[in-house]
A protein has these predicted regions:
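Conserved GNAT-family N-acetyltransferase fold
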Residues: 34, 53, 77
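Histidine-centered metal-chelating micro-motifs
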Residues: 41-42, 61, 77, 81-86
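A short, N-terminal "cap"/entry segment at the start of jelly-roll beta-barrel domains
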Residues: 1-28, 109
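Glycine- and acidic-residue-biased ligand/ion/polar-headgroup-sensing regions
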Residues: 49-60, 65
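Conserved short histidine dyad/triad with adjacent acidic residue
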Residues: 32-46
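Short acidic-glycine-tyrosine-enriched beta hairpin
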Residues: 67-81
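Structural motif
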Residues: 30, 59-61, 68, 84, ...
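Ligand-binding loop in jelly-roll beta-barrel domains
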Residues: 81-106
């Protein structure tokens, strides 16, 4: 088993049309590199997993429990499990790195 991975060449999973992720996981955490195309929204949703992340490219609007912010590279967020949230990009695409705990089994592929 290797302890190192590269994002390039890793299989993608479509979240919604125009948004996809590449994931890596251990026993208790899952790392998700999310890419969202311009003019695309990951609609309001919830999951039982705690989610922490950081925007690494572009800008995206994120709403968490009714609080809405425009996030830029370097902006971070923490979303408790069960809290409704969404993300959307305007005229430019965006990329974020998310961490989930516990591991989201549906993201293991």
């Amino acid at each position: 088993m290797s302890y190192f991975k590269r994002a390039e060449g890793r299989a993608e999973k479509t979240l919604v049309p125009g948004a996809r992720t590449r994931t890596y996981w251990g026993d208790r955490i899952l790392l998700s590199l999310v890419e969202i195309d311009a003019n695309t929204e990951v609609p309001l949703h919830t999951h039982p997993h705690e989610q922490a992340g950081m925007v690494i490219e572009g800008e995206m609007e994120m709403g968490v429990a009714g609080e809405v912010r425009m996030l830029k590279p370097g902006d971070m967020y923490i979303i408790p499990g069960g809290v409704p949230h969404y993300a959307k990009c305007g005229d430019t695409p965006g990329k974020a790195l998310d961490i989930f705990s516990p591991v989201r089994e549906e993201f293991k592929y």
